[in-house]
Swiss-Prot record:
Signal peptide: none annotated. Its main location: membrane. The C-terminal domain called the BARA domain is dispensable for the construction of both VPS34 PI3-kinase complexes, but is specifically required for autophagy through the targeting of complex I to the pre-autophagosomal structure. GO terms for molecular function: phosphatidylinositol 3-kinase binding; protein-macromolecule adaptor activity. Belongs to the beclin family. This is Vacuolar protein sorting-associated protein 30. Required for cytoplasm to vacuole transport (Cvt), autophagy, nucleophagy, and mitophagy, as a part of the autophagy-specific VPS34 PI3-kinase complex I. This complex is essential to recruit the ATG8-phosphatidylinositol conjugate and the ATG12-ATG5 conjugate to the pre-autophagosomal structure. Also involved in endosome-to-Golgi retrograde transport as part of the VPS34 PI3-kinase complex II. GO terms for biological process: autophagosome assembly; cellular response to nitrogen starvation; cellular response to potassium ion starvation; cytoplasm to vacuole targeting by the Cvt pathway; late endosome to vacuole transport; mitophagy; pexophagy; phosphatidylinositol phosphate biosynthetic process. It comes from Candida glabrata (strain ATCC 2001 / BCRC 20586 / JCM 3761 / NBRC 0622 / NRRL Y-65 / CBS 138) (Yeast).
Length: 512
């Protein structure tokens, strides 16, 4: 085959997957018998006569000539047709193609075509490309219009898929055919059985009797069914009524439960509110008791000690060589002491004769009225870094005079307390004789507290006695020198007396 013919086989596409394909060269060299197989024949349609096709095909096959006669016939047929011309072909090949075409075996026909290609030789290669394409188009058109219901050409892969599908259809058709055979045999057997008249009449009689029994049984069952249906209707009505009653009962129970739950919820909320309010009330009472027990003076002026130092509000009052304390801290402590004495005198309305306190923090002062000058003189109650001749000559300074004035003020306040105690004690003794038992129950605690506070000053007065510029025999004057251990001890005694005054003042104020 030349290149022109070979290229002509590439212009076709698979009608299934639409991919270009190459037509097998054997399609250009078909025999007459092969071409006849491609033509549709009415006698090959499915039907009852299909079973006789095999015998008719065998008869036609026997009429086929062999040898030179068959070759001559084939050559004449090919020369008179519009298809391709083939050389002499062996009769056995045509016979085999015809048999395999009648049996519809595509696999055998493919192997036959492969063997035939090796023996064929094209006689006429002068045909044009259009003629070859036209012939192949006619060939595919004939194949497509046949009873196969397949559009040609198709590729090898699509052909394999269709062969599997046709094989499945074939198996289904065989099963259907077998089913028809069985049905036909059954009908034939039934016809043979009914041919016996005696048996038929007996069967008819039995059928009649059986029919009567069936009718009677049917009537009985219908009557029984009617009764059952009536009972069922009654039961359905009773069930519906009971269901309605149950639904109403459940609805009432839900409503009642809802109301009870609401009441319980309100009760729980009320109890929680009561508990919360009671807890808040108790908490506030505890706070009130704590506030009542709290002494504002003790909280404001905390007097304590740290080793050899006395402290007021955490400030050390004193200093010596081994433990130096800054002047600013000492001045602040003296300012707190002045503020404490002024607070006690103003709270109990005690008038200090000849002195006026000026609490100004770390620069507090005290003023003293001088009778000979008939004027007030102010003394500093803080250490100053200013230069003064008194410090050089170790003379009495304003600070020393102020400290002496501070001792005199403490002594006056203690004497005022003693006067108040003596007057209150006389009054309490007279009241004690005239009060009734009920008044004793109401005010006994206050009187006992008052008496205890009175005894504090009637029995021992101040813990450390004050005499001029000395407290417990120790002078509070420095004469311009640095603070020492002796002066620090004197300050400790002074703060101790001040704390006693503070306790007495707190007791009096709590009773009021």
């Amino acid at each position: 085959m030349n290149d022109l013919q070979f290229d002509s086989l590439k212009v076709f596409k698979c009608q299934n997957c639409h991919l270009p394909l190459q037509v097998d060269p054997t399609m250009l060299h078909l025999s007459k018998s092969q071409r006849e197989l491609l033509l549709p024949r009415e006698d090959r349609r499915p039907g009852v006569e299909e079973f006789n096709l095999r015998q008719e095909s065998q008869d036609m096959l026997k009429k086929v000539k062999t040898g030179k006669e068959a070759k001559q016939l084939l050559k004449e047929d090919f020369q008179s047709s519009d298809f391709l011309f083939l050389r002499d072909i062996d009769d056995s090949i045509a016979e085999k193609d015809l048999k395999k075409g009648l049996e519809g075996d595509n696999d055998d026909r493919k192997s036959n075509e492969d063997s035939m290609v090796s023996e064929l030789d094209v006689e006429d290669t002068a045909k044009t490309l259009s003629t070859q394409i036209e012939r192949l188009s006619k060939l595919f058109e004939i194949m497509s219009t046949s009873e196969s219901n397949i559009d040609y050409p198709i590729c090898q892969e699509c052909c394999n898929i269709m062969m599997k599908r046709l094989k499945t259809d074939y198996e289904k058709a065989v099963k259907e055919r077998d089913l028809y055979f069985q049905f036909v045999k059954r009908i034939e057997k039934q016809q043979l059985d009914e041919s016996d008249s005696s048996q038929l009449s007996l069967r008819q009689k039995e059928y009649t009797d059986q029919t009567k029994k069936i009718n009677q049984e049917r009537e009985r069952l219908l009557l029984e069914l009617t009764k059952k249906e009536q009972v069922e209707e009654e039961l359905d009505a009773e069930i519906a009524e009971l269901t309605r009653q149950i639904s109403e009962k459940k609805a009432n129970e839900r409503a009642t439960r809802k109301i009870d739950n609401a009441k319980q919820w309100d009760k729980m909320k009320l109890l929680n509110d009561i508990s919360s309010l009671q807890y808040q009330y108790e908490t506030e009472l505890n706070k009130l008791d704590q506030l009542r027990k709290t002494n504002i003076y003790n909280e404001s002026f905390r007097i304590s000690h740290q080793g050899p130092f006395a402290t007021i509000c955490g400030l050390k009052l004193g200093s010596y060589e081994d433990h130096k304390v800054s002047y600013s801290e000492i001045n602040a402590a003296l300012g707190q002491l002045v503020l404490l004495l002024m607070t006690i005198s103003s709270s109990l309305n005690i008038k200090i004769s000849g002195y006026r306190l000026q609490p100004i923090g770390s620069t507090s002062k005290v003023s003293k009225f001088l009778a000979d000058k008939e004027d007030w003189e102010t003394y500093e109650l803080y250490f100053s870094s200013n230069f003064s001749l008194e410090k050089i000559f170790k003379r009495e300074t304003d600070f020393d005079k102020g400290m002496e004035s501070l001792l005199d003020i403490v002594k006056q306040i203690s004497l005022s307390f003693s006067t108040v105690v003596s007057s209150d004690t006389d009054i309490n003794i007279q009241d004690e004789r005239t009060r009734s038992n009920d008044s004793m129950l109401n005010g006994g605690a206050n009187r006992n507290a008052n008496l205890r506070a009175d005894r504090l000053f009637t029995e021992s007065e101040l813990p450390y006695m004050i005499d001029g510029d000395r407290i417990n025999g120790i002078s509070v004057k420095l004469y311009g020198a640095e603070p020492n251990l002796e002066w620090t001890t004197a300050m400790k005694f002074l703060l101790t007396d001040a704390k006693w005054l503070l306790v007495f003042c707190s007791s009096k104020l709590s009773l009021q």
